[in-house]
Amino acid sequence: VIKIPMVCLYLLQCLLVPKYASDIKEGAMIKEYYNSEKNHDVLILGDCEVYENISPVTMWENYGISSYIRGSAEQLIWQSYYLLEDTLKYEKPQVVIVNVLAMTQRDAKSEAYNRMTLDGMKLSKYKIASIRESMTEEENMASYIFPLLRYHSRWSELSSEDFRYMWKTPSVTTNGYLMQKGVRPVKTIPKAAPLANYTSVSYTHLTLPTNS
């Protein structure tokens, strides 16, 4: 008797969670990894700097290197760490590349960005740890473990896409690379601004001992 309500809740959750198939595709990328072959030479972690600029197809065609990008929008450095731990359960790549620019961000920006990284992870101790480190004050752990708690009111926003992809969403990337029509190769590099003068805080201001 208990199983019937549980099944109904599960079906409802599958229907109500966002599918990210045609809009905000970044939200589908983390989950896609689990359907890929687990034999990559290189694993790449980070945000749009990696998943819009590094092409696993080009790496394979030109150098014979198999790679996968576990990228997501505004991916934080600790999220990259737990994604790495999660990935190492499935394979052992020879090289791991991490976008260290994320180290400049100390706090999560919003629930929306958190969701695009965390919702797609399979439930594990690494997902729970990443949730704990990422949550804003308004968020709670239960809504990540049971997404229905977060998306139960989304019924009024449902579209045909939610029904079509209730069980399986189409791939939006190629090995984690998200093709964006608006992204173009750099043709000119603007002149960099002059660096600030850090003389006052450098070692040159120290009074060094002199030989008497």
Predicted regions and their residues:
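Hydrophobic membrane-insertion alpha-helices, especially the h-region
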Residues: 1-17
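Short, flexible loop segments at the rims of nucleotide/cofactor-binding pockets, characterized by
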Residues: 18-24, 45-46, 72-76
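A short, hydrophobic C-terminal helix/tail in secreted or cell-surface proteins
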Residues: 207-211
